[in-house]
Amino acid sequence: MKRIGVLTSGGDSPGMNAAVRAVVRKAIYHDVEVYGIYNGYSGLISGKIEKLELGSVGDIIHRGGTKLYTARCPEFKTVEGREKGIENLKKLGIEGLVVIGGDGSYMGAKKLTEHGFPCVGVPGTIDNDIPGTDFTIGFDTALNTVIDAIDKIRDTATSHERTYVIEVMGRHAGDIALWAGLAGGAESILIPEADYDMQEIIGRLKRGHDRGKKHSIIIVAEGVGSGVEFGKRIEEETNLETRVSVLGHIQRGGSPSASDRVLASRLGAYAVELLLKGKGGRCVGIQNNKLVDHDIIEILESKHTVEPNMYQLSKELSI
């Protein structure tokens, strides 16, 4: 394999640039040319593809977002769209592709593999919801962004003796809410993977208030429901002054943490190794601090789960 491509797809995550950098440098180290596909699968179809050199990835390891940009691409879900993308790759002599993104990006890589084009997936999403890896690129940075927000909100919650509901990202996965809630000392954590009892939460808030507790923090993953609605209900049923903060897309931005930079570098380089060994249709990950790879179809058919012991711990510590 003498030429490979790399693209970022789906929602951006801090550390994607570090992964792109690792792909380019690892490939060039092995005398393999690298082409960057801009705007994800959309750029693959439109032919927005450029050769990347060492200088192309200079000064990006510490930058959030993605140098290659990203976009949603409904057209790629069609056979015609995928065939057009493969045609553009073959015109340039590109023989393999590294795809950095979440499960939607993995689905695109799977489809390309089924068309006979070798792809390797690299998990890049703040949600940490990709099976087969302990952590995804961007999760640690997003987690630290949320924890920083919790700490600051707690300062004002304490000053005004208020209850705060903080809504975080996580439409289908509660990792951000769970980890940030544990690290931030939240009184209640609501995640999509676990049922909750609203009356139990309200009772806990009332008991805390009765014993002199001046403020409370409740973390709600967006997949559970609207933080605004939770805030209204809590205030109505407890008579405690309640405010809501929806963190939104700030969770996706920012300079990647040291952990995410290292993870992205390891996974990006490993993806190139797999392609050069002729191993397409795979996706990479980290488990117990060791690099692993899995069949991409198996991963797409698997379901990510949160650590049940961590969720139980969060309940035990929030009494």
From Swiss-Prot:
The active site is at 127 (proton acceptor). It comes from the Bacteria. ADP binds at residues 21-25, 154, 185-187, 211, 213-215. Its main location: cytoplasm. Its EC number is 2.7.1.11. It is found in: Cytoplasm. Pathway: Carbohydrate degradation; glycolysis; D-glyceraldehyde 3-phosphate and glycerone phosphate from D-glucose: step 3/4. ATP binds at residues 11, 72-73, 102-105. Its cofactor is Mg(2+). One of its GO terms (cellular component) is 6-phosphofructokinase complex. Substrate binds at residues 125-127, 162, 169-171, 222, 243, 249-252. One of its GO terms (biological process) is fructose 1,6-bisphosphate metabolic process. Mg(2+) binds at residue 103. Allosterically activated by ADP and other diphosphonucleosides, and allosterically inhibited by phosphoenolpyruvate. It catalyses: beta-D-fructose 6-phosphate + ATP = beta-D-fructose 1,6-bisphosphate + ADP + H(+). InterPro entries: ATP_PFK, ATP_PFK_prok-type, PFKA_ATP_prok, Phosphofructokinase_CS, Phosphofructokinase_dom, PKF_sf. GO terms for molecular function: 6-phosphofructokinase activity; AMP binding; ATP binding; fructose-6-phosphate binding; identical protein binding; metal ion binding; monosaccharide binding. Belongs to the phosphofructokinase type A (PFKA) family. ATP-dependent PFK group I subfamily. Prokaryotic clade 'B1' sub-subfamily. PANTHER family: ATP-DEPENDENT 6-PHOSPHOFRUCTOKINASE, PHOSPHOFRUCTOKINASE. Catalyzes the phosphorylation of D-fructose 6-phosphate to fructose 1,6-bisphosphate by ATP, the first committing step of glycolysis. Homotetramer. This is ATP-dependent 6-phosphofructokinase. It comes from Bacillus velezensis (strain DSM 23117 / BGSC 10A6 / LMG 26770 / FZB42) (Bacillus amyloliquefaciens subsp. plantarum).
